[in-house]
Amino acid sequence: MVLKLYVRKSLNLSENEMTKEMIHAGICLCEHETPNDIMIFKVDDNEFFKLIQNSRDIKFENVIRKKKIGDEYVDSWYGILF
């Protein structure tokens, strides 16, 4: 199952640097950014915890399985990148 990973852009990293960090963690870029400074990545549900372990400087908080988009909830992971 493929989920979307919503990551708030870090003030300390450029978008290019952040994308490289996510790719290093094995996460493929799905959409570059949204109006809310959130970058959206595609991630396989079964790989999620392995991706977290493999990431170097990426820390995820407030991990949830459902994210409300408009009036509907979608399967997703939500993380804040520091």
Ranges and model annotations:
Residues M1-F82:
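Positively charged, small/polar-rich N-terminal and surface patches that mediate targeting and assembly
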